Amino acid sequence: MNNFDKKIDNYLQNFEALASLSLRFILGIAFIFYGSRKFPLPPEGLVEYYDLHPILASTVALSELLSGIIIIIAAFIKNPLGNILTRLAGLNIVLLMSSILVVAHSDWFITTKLFSSVQIFLLVSGLFFFIKGNNK
């Protein structure tokens, strides 16, 4: 069994970067999608439904869009700047998703709704890139 495990590990090492890259692309595309749906600015839905100031609602939309773009582009920047951009985008995603869970979904805390929703996966994926950066 140990030998079989080593063979699988040796084979899959060739694809290790693909695991992080695929998670990064899905996360980035999701945030680009969610952010772009809030245009034109200010997003009237956020302003009216959550009673947000237009500047704050616009900041949310731009933060989502830019986080998605940056998390993808930073994968191809192979120097400390790429690592910093990845961590900043990850941190921004964590802050956005934490705020969204508190403001928009406060009834979800520690229920099946939370753990069966995309929001928790976006939050944890952002946390992954905040901690990991561009490091292997």
What are these regions (language model features)?
Residues 2-3, 40-54:
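Membrane-interface interhelical connector segments
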